[in-house]
Amino acid sequence: MSATSIQPLLDILFQGKALTREQTASLFSTLIQGEMNEAVMAGMLMALKIRGETIAEISGAADAMRAAAKPFPYPSSKRTEGIIDIVGTGGDGFNTINISTTAAFVAAAAGAKVAKHGNRSVSSKSGSSDLLAQFGIDLTMSPELASRCLESLNLCFLFAPHYHGGVKHAVPVRQALKTRTLFNVLGPLINPARPEFMLLGVYSPELVTPIARVLQALGTQRAMVVHGSGLDEVALHGSTQVAELKDGEIIEYQLTPADFGVPQAQISELEGGEPAQNAQITQSILQGQGSDAHTHAVAINAGCALYLCGLSDSVKAGTALALNTIKSGKAFELLNQLAKVSSETQE
């Protein structure tokens, strides 16, 4: 769309009115094609933020991003097995270990098909991609190879900038604004593998139910949107607020560590460090040699993923399966297999 054709949509926004899903998709399509002036982009993002984005607007922005993404070739088993993503928005302000990334290895080793969509760090010193790079896993592997990894190993990692090139047009504006915008919640919603199941952590409790409603609008089959006592994941140090999407309905409830069959820990016990240090922590957990707090934090998140996939009938049973999978060494073996496949492609 040209500058003149988007002006009526901007006028609606600047009057404090909401856009439809289709109108928002048109605006974001213009943005990611590099056809939006930076001043206009800043005005649009701030108008949305100040009024508060609607479910339709978040869904429309996600529609545009998904449509423009580099395609992901589905593996043949995709026809019968659903894919899950274990992902957080980041930006929760805590520098924890890489819980969701480590949980992805555990869930995959336990039988889930995990396509994890990740980026570099938002709130910690080490994001999903920072950690994987430490293990020699190629972040820019082709979509075809990623699909083969998902098929043969039950796991692949999709590096967001590799699939969503158009986001680069928003970087200068986002950096200049120095405040959260719609982009802070879009990342988890635009996985190019289009997972049927999602465990999605958000940085604010106010986002839990709205983001569940967005996933519902986007056609996600089953999901848990969680905020865990300050963290964008299931909490070991306190209660977790949940909005679960199941059979087209959203149910809201809270979970505590006792619901998973594990003891509560202090948030300080989950503090992470630089990528190299976090890689060592992840390796220890996957080898069955992690601290109780580290191991349990990973297991309760993997347990929720296994519950969502239908591999366990409760989050407690899922956690037990995750702990047994860690103990078996299968998750660490999977890490080595993925690193090996990745290194072979780089030679």
UniProtKB/Swiss-Prot annotation:
NCBIfam families: trpD
Entry annotated with the keyword Secreted: no
Annotated residues for binding of Mg(2+) 2: D232, E233
Pathway(s) served: Amino-acid biosynthesis; L-tryptophan biosynthesis; L-tryptophan from chorismate: step 2/5
Name of the encoding gene: trpD
Reaction(s) catalysed by this chain's protein: N-(5-phospho-beta-D-ribosyl)anthranilate + diphosphate = 5-phospho-alpha-D-ribose 1-diphosphate + anthranilate
Bound cofactor: record note: Binds 2 magnesium ions per monomer.
Residue positions binding anthranilate 2: R174
Keyword Transmembrane attributed: no
Residues that hold anthranilate 1 according to the record: G88, N119
UniProt record similarity statement: Belongs to the anthranilate phosphoribosyltransferase family.
Single Gene Ontology MF annotation: anthranilate phosphoribosyltransferase activity
InterPro entries: Anthranilate_Pribosyl_Tfrase, Glycosyl_Trfase_fam3, Glycosyl_Trfase_fam3_N_dom, Glycosyl_Trfase_fam3_N_dom_sf, Nuc_phospho_transferase
Assigned GO CC terms: cytosol
Cofactor(s) needed for function: Mg(2+)
Binding site for 5-phospho-alpha-D-ribose 1-diphosphate: 88, 91-92, 96, 98-101, 116-124, 128
Subunit structure: Homodimer.
Class in the EC hierarchy, top level: transferase
Gene Ontology biological-process entries: L-tryptophan biosynthetic process
Record-given protein name: Anthranilate phosphoribosyltransferase
EC number assigned by the record: 2.4.2.18
Taxonomic superkingdom: Bacteria
Pfam family for this entry, one: Glycos_transf_3
Residues at which Mg(2+) 1 binds: S100, E233
Keywords tagged on the record: Amino-acid biosynthesis, Aromatic amino acid biosynthesis, Glycosyltransferase, Magnesium, Metal-binding, Transferase, Tryptophan biosynthesis
Function: Catalyzes the transfer of the phosphoribosyl group of 5-phosphorylribose-1-pyrophosphate (PRPP) to anthranilate to yield N-(5'-phosphoribosyl)-anthranilate (PRA).
